[in-house]
Amino acid sequence: MEMNVGKIVNTHGVKGEVKILTASDFAAERFKPGKVLMIPFKNERVTLTIKSYRTHKNFHMLAFEGLNNINDVEKYKGLDVYQEIENEDIILDENEYFYSDIIGCTVFDGEREIGIVNDIFETGANDVWVVQGDKEYLIPYIEDVVKSIDIDNKKIIIEAIEGLL
């Protein structure tokens, strides 16, 4: 399955490194050197192999094999990057889920439908789900709030703490 794993938001330095704003979970695993990314560019699909990966100020910094200066990567700025995903290669602990499993789930506060998870971002302490309903809600993925997750039926039950909704 091919999945959008981020966007090249800028170049970094003059040696061909790019800043990626991730749209995926497990970035350190997804962006390991040797992994392959695809970029739709001018009606083609460019395939790039990751040469190096590091984090810097909440961004993921990548360099690609064969692209050794800023001129080689400048043209990809602003483009989404995709990867062939094999989620089954990553073993999850209990109460851990892939972003792709959570995004698209309908969230309920008891019986009341709140909305659909359309994005997830990391805060350091816990993930926060962006839920779009009659307005946008930010739901922390913490035990006190999230009571059950049913991936098969794309249904999440929360117990909203005061001020959350």
Curated annotation (Swiss-Prot):
Keywords from the UniProt entry: Chaperone, Cytoplasm, Ribosome biogenesis, rRNA processing
SUPFAM superfamilies: PRC-barrel domain (SSF50346), Translation proteins (SSF50447)
Species assigned in the record: Macrococcus caseolyticus (strain JCSC5402)
Function: An accessory protein needed during the final step in the assembly of 30S ribosomal subunit, possibly for assembly of the head region. Essential for efficient processing of 16S rRNA. May be needed both before and after RbfA during the maturation of 16S rRNA. It has affinity for free ribosomal 30S subunits but not for 70S ribosomes.
PANTHER family: RIBOSOME MATURATION FACTOR RIMM
Subcellular compartments: Cytoplasm
Pfam family, one: PRC_RimM
Gene: rimM
Limits of the PRC barrel domain: 93-164
Gene3D superfamilies assigned to the protein according to its UniProt record, in alphabetical order: PRC-barrel domain, RimM
Family: Belongs to the RimM family.
GO biological process: ribosomal small subunit biogenesis; rRNA processing
InterPro entries, per the entry: PRC_barrel-like_sf (IPR011033), PRC_RimM (IPR056792), RimM (IPR011961), RimM_N (IPR002676), RimM_N_sf (IPR036976), Transl_B-barrel_sf (IPR009000)
GO molecular function, one term: ribosome binding
Domain of life of the organism encoding this protein: Bacteria
Identification of the protein by name: Ribosome maturation factor RimM
Domains (record comment): The PRC barrel domain binds ribosomal protein uS19.
Oligomer and partners: Binds ribosomal protein uS19.
GO cellular component: cytoplasm; ribosome
